[in-house]
């Protein structure tokens, strides 16, 4: 059962001090993300995608990719995931 706003003594509960009129404004850092951060973020996502596409299309004819075998998927997805995780820091 919900509690009423009046206490057992009959006096009303005190108002909280966190109302919008009592709050002081906080300055938010309005600087955007540096351009190099965005370039690295997009570059990693595209590099991961490119790695997977090249592995799929020509992986058997490229010697070092043939030696890596299934690790190519880990490398490609790893690069793409790092780029995607970087999007959380983008402003």
Curated annotation (Swiss-Prot):
Polar residues biased stretches: 1-24
One Pfam family named in its UniProt record: CrgA
The name this protein goes by in its record: Cell division protein CrgA
Record bears the keyword Cell membrane: yes
Originating species: Corynebacterium aurimucosum (strain ATCC 700975 / DSM 44827 / CIP 107346 / CN-1) (Corynebacterium nigricans)
Keywords attached to this entry: Cell cycle, Cell division, Cell membrane, Membrane, Transmembrane, Transmembrane helix
Region (Disordered): 1-28
Family stated for the protein in its record: Belongs to the CrgA family.
Phylogenetic lineage: Bacteria, Bacillati, Actinomycetota, Actinomycetes, Mycobacteriales
